[in-house]
Regions:
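Terminal, basic amphipathic appendages of nucleotide-handling enzymes
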Residues: 1-19, 25-26, 30-85
Length: 85
């Protein structure tokens, strides 16, 4: 990877406005669910990645220092899914 920043566009609900979050995890793919800090109180929220863009520092769409970071990729435990028997 030769770019400085990975910006992921995420949606909180399907069809809603997308928001940029930064990540250093280049294993995240479009369609993945990730955990992010959301709102003024930075509560944790599960969102879906709808686009991934790579930028050099001079080309970032939002200042990196003002952009929140993805916490991590989601696991089954984040969805409280029943375990298969």
């Amino acid at each position: 990877r030769t770019t400085d920043y990975i910006y992921c566009s995420v949606v909180f609900e399907e069809g809603q406005k997308s928001y940029y979050y930064l990540t250093e995890d280049d294993s995240i793919k479009i369609g993945d669910f990730v955990l992010v800090p959301a709102g003024k109180d930075n509560h944790e929220a599960v969102v879906q990645v709808v686009d991934i863009e790579y930028f050099f520092a001079e080309d970032v769409p939002l200042p990196a220092e003002k952009t929140k970071h993805i916490i991590r990729k989601c696991t089954d435990e984040d969805f409280d899914l029943p375990k298969p028997e």
